[in-house]
């Protein structure tokens, strides 16, 4: 079932973030960065969905330059989506990037949403 169809059937508009796999790591989800603009423009045409922004998880490396590069690329991608002027893309303003370990880098690169679970709840206990 398409989420767009479900939202329309319920008479609601659902805000969505498009996840982009900026690190290219196979352990992470998200679309290929090369397709992010086209996918965002497609989402912008779907009834019942409002593209509110993009999200990514930073590269799992110790090299801060590499981490920042992914965040910077996502910000530039968001800016290109907004500049495209395509219908339904003007609401794409949020950048959800950065977690406890890299939130300062993400904020420096323009993040508007950070996910700080470990800083609040501590390390996960894996069973």
What does each model-identified segment do?
Residues 6-14:
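Helix C-cap/alpha-to-beta connector motif
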């Amino acid at each position: 079932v398409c989420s767009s169809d479900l939202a329309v059937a319920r008479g609601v508009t659902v805000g969505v973030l498009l996840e982009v796999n900026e690190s290219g790591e196979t352990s992470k989800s998200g679309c290929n960065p090369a397709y992010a603009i086209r996918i965002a423009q497609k989402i912008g045409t779907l009834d019942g969905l409002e593209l509110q922004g993009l999200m990514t998880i930073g590269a799992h490396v110790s090299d801060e330059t590499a981490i920042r590069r992914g965040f910077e690329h996502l910000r530039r991608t968001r800016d290109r989506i907004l500049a495209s002027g395509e219908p339904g893309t003007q609401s794409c303003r949020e950048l959800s990037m950065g977690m406890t370990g890299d939130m300062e880098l993400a904020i420096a690169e323009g993040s508007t949403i950070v996910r700080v679970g470990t800083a609040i709840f501590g390390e996960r206990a894996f069973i």
